[in-house]
Structure formats: structure tokens, C-alpha cells
Amino acid sequence: MAAKTSNLVALLLSLFLLLLSISSQVGLGEAKRNLRNNLRLDCVSHPSPPPPHRSMAPPIFVPPSTSHKGQGP
């Protein structure tokens, strides 16, 4: 029974350490991204103008095929 308890404790401890490691890596990634975004915003003196507005092109009309099923073109 002591061996099962020992294995269970080791498993839970390993899972906890894995979770802690993953969460710290995610936190570091977010911190780096935020720092990069803040530095990028500091370098920009004024926002760039929005892209020009494009009008929507009309859809292309494709006539239905004149060939019948089972017959050639």
C-alpha cells in the first residue's frame, strides 16, 4: 500500500511541476509579446492612415452548361 501511495504522490508532484512549468512559459511568452508591442508603439510617432476604401466588384456571371448528363460536350 505504501508503494501505491508513493507512486501516486510522485505522479501528482510530476503533474504539478509540469503544469507549473507550462504556465511559467506561457507567462514569459505573454510578457515578451507585451514588451515587444509596447516598444513598437513607442517607436511610432503617429498612427498610419487607414487603407483606401475599395468598392466591391460585381460577381462574375457564369452561364449554365449546355451539355446534358451522360452526353459529350
From Swiss-Prot:
Signal peptide start-end = 1-31
Q: What job does the chain carry out?
A: Brassicaceae-specific phytocytokine (plant endogenous peptide released into the apoplast) perceived by MIK2 in a BAK1/SERK3 and SERK4 coreceptors-dependent manner, that modulates various physiological and antimicrobial processes including growth prevention and reactive oxygen species (ROS) response regulation. Inhibits root growth and regulates root meristems. Prevents general growth and development. Exhibits antibacterial effects against Pseudomonas syringae pv. tomato DC3000, Ralstonia solanacearum, Bacillus subtilis and Agrobacterium tumefaciens, thus being an antimicrobial peptide (AMP).
Q: Which UniProt keywords apply?
A: Apoplast, Cell membrane, Cleavage on pair of basic residues, Membrane, Secreted, Signal
Can you name the source organism? Arabidopsis thaliana
Record region (Disordered): 44-73
Q: What is this protein called?
A: Serine rich endogenous peptide 14
Task: Give GO BP annotations, semicolon-separated.
Answer: defense response; defense response to bacterium; response to bacterium; response to cold; response to ethylene; response to jasmonic acid; response to salicylic acid; response to salt stress
Q: Name one GO cellular component term.
A: plasma membrane
- Please give one Gene Ontology molecular function term for this protein: LRR domain binding
Tell me where the sequence motif SxS motif essential for MIK2 binding sits in this chain: 65-67
Subunit details: Interacts with MIK2 (via extracellular leucine-rich repeat domain); this interaction triggers the formation of complex between MIK2 and the BAK1/SERK3 and SERK4 coreceptors, and subsequent BAK1 activation by phosphorylation.
**Primary location group:** membrane
Cite the record's Polar residues compositional bias ranges: 64-73
Cellular compartments annotated: Cell membrane; Secreted, Extracellular space, Apoplast
**Entry's induction text:** Induced by cold, drought and salt stress, but repressed by pathogenic bacteria Pseudomonas syringae pv. tomato (Pst) DC3000, jasmonate (MeJA), ethylene (ET) and salicylic acid (SA), mainly in shoots.
